[in-house]
Amino acid sequence: MVKALLVGSKVLIPNVDESRYIYSNGFYGKAIGISKPKGPKDIIRPLELSLIESVYLAKKGLIKVIDKNGEVLEYEKLYEYSSKIINKFDIMYRVYEDLREKGFIVRSGVKYGADFAVYTLGPGLEHAPYVVIAVDIDEEITPHELLSFGRVSHSTRKRLVLALVDRKSESVRYIMFKWVKM
């Protein structure tokens, strides 16, 4: 199991060989100081994982997260810690996990004004065809919010997907929007 260190809102894998291994198994994380690796061979520095990625990898048994006191944070504790730091973590994690289980590569979508950028092949191999916004199915979305979501996806030439999470059933439904010329 790969050793990872919890540092605030990030998790670091200091060993480069272990970083390369984790990256090669699904494009997880970002190598520190390397902006756009083309593949695992370009991972020559420690890897930085988001909390969402870390919780997922801990649940899968691929990483062991250790806090500053040397305590190992099992999946449940890491999930609880992440929930305190990230707004709507439960909703976002449920969508992340669902997309990963469906075989997609899921990265942060912050630069696109979304929760996630989603790839079918992976970063460096294609541009992300989708941006995903995670939403609680019981929350209302205003027309203004919907328009602003759509503008971002249109200006970046990506398809907008709303991921609707039902907390009761833990199911996720997806609605995709596409711009058309008329």
UniProtKB/Swiss-Prot annotation:
CDD domains according to UniProt: tRNA-intron_lyase_C
Gene3D superfamilies: 3.40.1350.10, tRNA intron endonuclease, N-terminal domain
Pfam families noted in UniProt: tRNA_int_endo, tRNA_int_endo_N
Keywords carried by this UniProt record: Lyase, tRNA processing
Keyword Lyase applies: yes
Tagged with keyword tRNA processing: yes
InterPro entries with a match to the protein in the record: tRNA_endonuc-like_dom_sf (IPR011856), tRNA_intron_Endo_cat-like_sf (IPR036167), tRNA_intron_Endonuc_cat-like (IPR006677), tRNA_intron_Endonuc_N (IPR006678), tRNA_intron_Endonuc_N_sf (IPR036740), tRNA_splic (IPR006676), tRNA_splic_arch_short (IPR016442)
Active site feature: Y119, H127, K158
Catalytic activities: pretRNA = a 3'-half-tRNA molecule with a 5'-OH end + a 5'-half-tRNA molecule with a 2',3'-cyclic phosphate end + an intron with a 2',3'-cyclic phosphate and a 5'-hydroxyl terminus
Top-level taxonomic group: Archaea
EC number from the UniProt entry: 4.6.1.16
Top-level EC class as recorded in UniProt: lyase
Protein function: Endonuclease that removes tRNA introns. Cleaves pre-tRNA at the 5'- and 3'-splice sites to release the intron. The products are an intron and two tRNA half-molecules bearing 2',3' cyclic phosphate and 5'-OH termini. Recognizes a pseudosymmetric substrate in which 2 bulged loops of 3 bases are separated by a stem of 4 bp.
Quaternary structure and interacting proteins, as annotated: Homotetramer; although the tetramer contains four active sites, only two participate in the cleavage. Therefore, it should be considered as a dimer of dimers.
Family label: Belongs to the tRNA-intron endonuclease family. Archaeal short subfamily.
Protein name: tRNA-splicing endonuclease
